[in-house]
């Protein structure tokens, strides 16, 4: 773990290295992913079955084997522990309520001369949602992807999730039933992205693909973008924390480890103007590591991609964090809302000592599918707008076209587009 201060002579180099760590290099998998996509485009279901045999260690006999039955999803839901079922329902309700507030509205504006201008917002026809499966299956990811698509009004929702050894994750199936999803396919990785982007005999082509995944999934999404829309190209999970002396060192340590336990590539960075707090957090990290079930993963992550940085003041800490533009940003300070206007770049901001990042993963309401690797400088969280499109509406009356027609025709003439010019002039009153 990098443990440093901004006053160190080597800090600029250390910080630059820290920023580079967060970037995802897809060059080494691009050729493999490109081949997978080409095989799906050419051989469709047959290629899917071959890829499932190779990567998930089971062989679909028929095309029907690719799809998970609604009966198995219903059964998984009924078998859920009562408390867990209630928790999933509460999560669903909170996520839906938040995303309902996001929904963009169509608008129209009438001008006195009879011109009508507007913007119509409508859902895409179909969406493909990729949900990681196997041991890393997260029902929360299903809720976070399905709900905004449903709120947007998408009629056809397809879910793809890998099922190693043909054993679907029961929690994931239960969440599918809770959300009312019926088209769920046992396909993962780049193969799933290609299948949803181009269609097979079983899996329909969709308009937009969303959802998290490993480097092969991220690379496939990047490659199919343009043939379909995508939400973002997300890399390993990351957390940034701004903290002052009012923060609890033990809380800060476990918050950092909440990302580190995801995988070895996850990033956890805390920046504070307090050397005392930094020292205490470093000690608490070791205490927490001793008791975590995923200690090995968390330790490797925190050692290779963790950092605690001490700055001269909070403004410098904020400036550094804006440069990082983390996926998740906790502001664990005495007056977090006073700092909020100074924070420019983050996927989601968690304000105050009682707002751990984990509450945003499951229950707060905002989406947990967030931009990573510094892309929060230009990408936004997954939301309802990812499943909607805007169409411009234009209507001119005879009076309106005559009021601006000459000026419009003049610009067309200057651009050398005679048919454009004449299509306006023929409508003008001489």
From Swiss-Prot:
It catalyses: L-histidinol + 2 NAD(+) + H2O = L-histidine + 2 NADH + 3 H(+). The keyword Translocase does not apply. Zn(2+) binds at residues 259, 262, 361, 420. GO terms for biological process: L-histidine biosynthetic process. Transmembrane segments: none annotated. The keyword Oxidoreductase applies. Its cofactor is Zn(2+). Binds 1 zinc ion per subunit. CDD domains: Histidinol_dh. GO terms for molecular function: histidinol dehydrogenase activity; NAD binding; zinc ion binding. One of its GO terms (cellular component) is cytosol. Its EC number is 1.1.1.23. Substrate binds at residues 237, 259, 262, 328, 361, 415, 420. Pathway: Amino-acid biosynthesis; L-histidine biosynthesis; L-histidine from 5-phospho-alpha-D-ribose 1-diphosphate: step 9/9. The active site is at 327 (proton acceptor), 328 (proton acceptor). Keywords: Amino-acid biosynthesis, Histidine biosynthesis, Metal-binding, NAD, Oxidoreductase, Zinc. Belongs to the histidinol dehydrogenase family. Catalyzes the sequential NAD-dependent oxidations of L-histidinol to L-histidinaldehyde and then to L-histidine. This is Histidinol dehydrogenase. The gene is hisD.
């Amino acid at each position: 773990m990098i443990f440093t201060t901004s006053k160190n002579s080597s800090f600029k180099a250390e910080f630059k290295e820290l920023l580079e760590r967060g970037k995802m290099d897809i060059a080494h998998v691009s050729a493999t992913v490109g081949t997978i996509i080409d095989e799906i485009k050419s051989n469709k279901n047959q290629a899917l079955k071959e890829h499932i045999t190779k990567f998930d260690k089971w062989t679909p006999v028929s095309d029907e084997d690719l799809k998970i039955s609604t009966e198995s999803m219903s059964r998984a839901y009924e078998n859920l522990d009562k408390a867990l079922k209630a928790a999933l329902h509460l999560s669903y309700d909170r996520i839906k309520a938040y995303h309902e507030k996001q929904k963009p509205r169509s608008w129209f504006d009438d001008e006195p001369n009879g011109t009508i201008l507007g913007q119509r917002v409508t859902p895409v026809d179909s969406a493909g949602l990729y949900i990681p499966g196997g041991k890393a299956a997260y029902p929360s990811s299903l809720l976070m992807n399905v709900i905004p698509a449903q709120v947007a009004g998408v009629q056809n929702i397809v879910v793809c999730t890998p099922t190693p050894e043909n054993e679907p994750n029961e929690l994931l199936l239960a969440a599918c039933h809770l959300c009312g999803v019926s088209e769920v396919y046992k396909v993962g990785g780049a193969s799933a992205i290609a299948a949803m982007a181009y269609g097979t005999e079983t899996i329909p082509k969709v308009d937009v693909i969303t959802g998290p995944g490993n480097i092969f999934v991220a690379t496939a999404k990047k490659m199919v973008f343009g043939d379909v829309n995508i939400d973002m190209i997300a890399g390993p999970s990351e957390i940034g924390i701004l903290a002052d002396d009012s923060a609890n060192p033990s809380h800060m340590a476990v918050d950092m480890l909440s990302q580190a336990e995801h995988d070895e590539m996850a990033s956890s960075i805390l920046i504070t103007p307090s050397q005392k707090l930094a020292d205490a957090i470093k000690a608490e990290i070791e205490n927490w590591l001793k008791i975590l079930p995923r200690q090995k993963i968390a330790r490797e992550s925190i050692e290779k991609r963790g950092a605690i940085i001490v700055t001269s003041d909070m403004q410098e800490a904020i400036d550094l964090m804006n440069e990082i533009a983390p996926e998740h940003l906790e502001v664990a300070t005495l007056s977090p809302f006073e700092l909020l206007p100074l924070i420019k770049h983050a996927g989601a901001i968690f304000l105050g000592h009682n707002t751990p990042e984990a509450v945003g993963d499951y229950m707060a309401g905002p989406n947990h599918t967030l931009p990573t690797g510094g892309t929060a400088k230009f990408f936004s969280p997954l939301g309802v707008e990812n499943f909607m499109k805007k169409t411009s509406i234009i209507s001119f009356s005879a009076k309106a076209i005559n009021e601006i027609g000459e000026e419009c025709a003049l610009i067309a003439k200057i651009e050398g587009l005679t048919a454009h010019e004449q299509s306006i002039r023929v409508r003008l009153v001489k």
